[in-house]
C-alpha cells in the first residue's frame, strides 16, 4: 500500500474533537465577551480557524467543535465559515455545546468535555479519536501524528514541543520520555519543570493535542468519570494514570513541510497576542498566511477593498509595513507596522503605529496610537493619545500589560458592550 493511500485511510478513520470552550483569562478584558478560540488574529482570521484548517489540510473531514464559555460569536463564525462540508461524502464540522448529557453539570474539564460527547463520537465509528486544543495559533500536519501513533502501536500519543523552562512553569504539561519517545512521567503545569536531558534550558511540553485508539479512550474516560477525586482533565488525571501500564508516546511537533521551521504560538496573554500579530509584518514571517500549500480557511465577508485617500502635504492616507484588511479606509492618516482588521476607519491627521486594531474600529481625527490593542467596535475620540504614557493610559481606565502594550475596549470608553 502506498504511503499516500495509507495516510488517507488513517485520516478517514479519524474523528477530531477541537476543545474550544476556554476563556483565556490571561487576556483579561479581550475575552470578556468571547471565548479565546473566537479571538481575532492575523487581519481576518479567528484562532479557531487554525486547528480547523489543520484538520482540512491534513485530510481529516469529520470534526466536532466543543464550546462552552461565551460561545455565541464562536458558534456563529463556525456556522458561517465552515458549513460547506458535504455530509453525504462523510464530511462534517459539528458544534458540540455543553448539553448535560450525563449529568447536570457543564463541562468540568478537558476529559469531561470529551466524555460528555462519547455518544456522538461512537456514532461516527472512528478507529482513532484526535483531541485538539482550540486556542493556539499553529500550523501542523496531523497526518504525521496519526501515522506515528498507528506505527508505534500506542494506546495514546501526545504531541509535544520543546519550550524554555521558564516559559513552561505553571503554564504547560511537562513530560519525561525515553529514547523511543515513550512517556515515562507527566506533570501538569509544574512550577519547577523537569528539563530535557542534556539541555537545562528547555523542557518537553504538551501541546494539548492527543490521539487515542477509540475504545481505549472510552475506557479511560468512563474510569475517570467514576473517580470522585478527579479534576476530569487529560493532563492532570488521564495521562498520569495510564503511562505506567499502557503505551503512551510523545510525538515531536514538526513543520508540515520539509526544511521549514515549525510554527506554534501560545497567544494567551496580551503581550504574546500582540507580538504574534506583529511577527506577521515581517517580509518573511514564520507564519506565512499567503502560502497556497497550506491555506488558512475562514469566513469570508463580502467587503469592498481597502482605500487610502488624500495626498496633501499635511495629511496623506498611507500605510507602511502593515496588514490592512477589506473595508478599511485610511483617510488622510498614517499607519505604520500595524495590523488592521476589516472595516477599520482611521481619520485625518491621526497616526497608528505598532498596533493591532480589531474590526469596526473608528479612530477619529488627531489621534496618536502606538503599542496598543484596540478591541472591536471602539470609537477613539478625537485627539486621544494611547501608548505614549502608561500612567496616563491607566488614568483613562485602559489596561497596560507587563511589557507595555495598552488594551482599549468599548467598556473602557463607556460604549455599549456585547458578544463579538
From Swiss-Prot:
Its EC number is 2.7.7.27. CDD domains: ADP_Glucose_PP, LbH_G1P_AT_C. It is an enzyme of class 2 (transferase). InterPro entries: ADP-Glc_PPase, ADP_Glu_pyroP_CS, GlgC_bac, GlmU/GlgC-like_hexapep, NTP_transferase_dom, Nucleotide-diphossugar_trans, Trimer_LpxA-like_sf. It catalyses: alpha-D-glucose 1-phosphate + ATP + H(+) = ADP-alpha-D-glucose + diphosphate. It comes from the Bacteria. GO terms for molecular function: ATP binding; glucose-1-phosphate adenylyltransferase activity. Alpha-D-glucose 1-phosphate binds at residues 107, 173, 188-189, 206. Belongs to the bacterial/plant glucose-1-phosphate adenylyltransferase family. Involved in the biosynthesis of ADP-glucose, a building block required for the elongation reactions to produce glycogen. Catalyzes the reaction between ATP and alpha-D-glucose 1-phosphate (G1P) to produce pyrophosphate and ADP-Glc. Homotetramer. HAMAP family: GlgC. This is Glucose-1-phosphate adenylyltransferase. It comes from Shewanella oneidensis (strain ATCC 700550 / JCM 31522 / CIP 106686 / LMG 19005 / NCIMB 14063 / MR-1).
Amino acid at each position: 500500500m502506498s504511503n499516500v493511500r495509507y495516510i488517507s485511510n488513517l485520516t478517514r478513520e479519524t474523528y477530531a474533537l477541537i476543545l474550544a470552550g476556554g476563556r483565556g483569562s490571561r487576556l483579561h478584558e479581550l475575552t470578556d465577551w468571547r471565548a479565546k478560540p473566537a479571538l481575532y488574529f492575523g487581519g481576518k482570521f479567528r484562532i479557531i480557524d487554525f486547528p480547523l484548517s489543520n484538520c482540512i489540510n491534513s485530510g481529516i473531514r469529520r470534526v466536532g467543535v466543543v464550546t462552552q464559555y461565551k460561545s455565541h460569536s464562536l458558534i456563529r463564525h463556525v456556522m458561517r465559515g465552515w458549513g460547506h462540508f458535504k455530509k453525504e461524502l462523510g464530511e462534517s464540522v459539528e458544534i458540540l455545546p455543553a448539553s448535560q448529557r450525563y449529568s447536570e453539570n457543564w463541562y468540568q474539564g478537558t476529559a469531561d468535555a470529551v466524555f460528555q460527547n462519547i455518544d456522538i463520537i461512537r456514532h461516527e465509528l472512528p478507529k482513532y479519536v484526535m483531541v485538539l486544543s482550540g486556542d493556539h495559533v499553529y500550523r501542523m500536519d496531523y497526518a504525521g501524528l496519526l501515522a506515528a501513533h498507528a506505527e508505534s502501536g500506542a494506546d495514546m500519543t501526545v504531541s509535544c514541543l520543546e519550550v524554555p523552562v521558564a516559559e513552561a512553569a505553571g503554564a504547560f504539561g511537562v513530560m519525561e520520555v525515553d529514547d523511543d519517545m515513550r512517556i515515562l512521567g507527566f506533570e501538569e503545569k509544574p512550577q519547577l519543570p523537569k528539563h530535557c536531558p542534556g539541555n537545562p534550558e528547555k523542557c518537553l511540553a504538551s501541546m494539548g493535542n492527543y490521539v487515542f485508539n477509540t475504545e481505549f479512550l472510552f475506557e479511560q474516560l468512563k474510569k475517570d468519570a467514576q473517580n470522585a477525586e478527579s479534576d476530569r482533565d487529560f493532563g492532570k488525571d488521564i495521562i498520569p494514570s495510564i503511562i505506567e501500564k499502557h503505551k503512551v508516546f510523545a510525538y515531536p511537533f514538526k513543520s508540515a513541510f520539509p526544511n521549514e521551521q515549525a510554527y506554534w504560538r501560545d497567544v494567551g496573554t496580551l503581550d504574546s497576542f500582540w507580538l504574534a500579530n506583529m511577527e506577521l509584518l515581517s517580509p518573511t514571517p514564520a507564519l506565512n498566511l499567503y502560502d497556497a500549500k497550506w491555506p488558512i480557511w475562514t469566513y469570508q465577508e463580502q467587503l469592498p477593498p481597502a482605500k487610502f485617500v488624500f495626498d496633501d502635504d499635511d495629511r496623506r492616507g498611507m500605510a507602511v509595513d502593515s496588514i490592512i484588511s477589506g473595508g478599511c479606509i485610511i483617510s488622510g492618516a498614517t499607519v505604520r507596522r500595524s495590523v488592521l482588521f476589516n472595516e477599520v476607519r482611521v481619520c485625518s491627521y491621526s497616526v497608528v503605529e505598532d498596533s493591532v486594531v480589531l474590526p469596526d474600529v473608528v479612530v477619529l481625527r488627531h489621534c496618536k496610537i502606538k503599542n496598543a490593542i484596540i478591541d472591536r467596535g471602539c470609537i477613539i475620540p478625537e485627539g486621544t493619545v494611547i501608548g505614549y504614557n502608561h500612567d496616563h493610559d491607566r488614568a483613562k481606565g485602559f489596561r497596560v500589560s507587563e511589557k507595555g502594550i495598552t488594551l482599549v475596549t468599548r467598556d473602557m470608553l463607556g460604549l455599549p458592550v456585547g458578544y463579538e
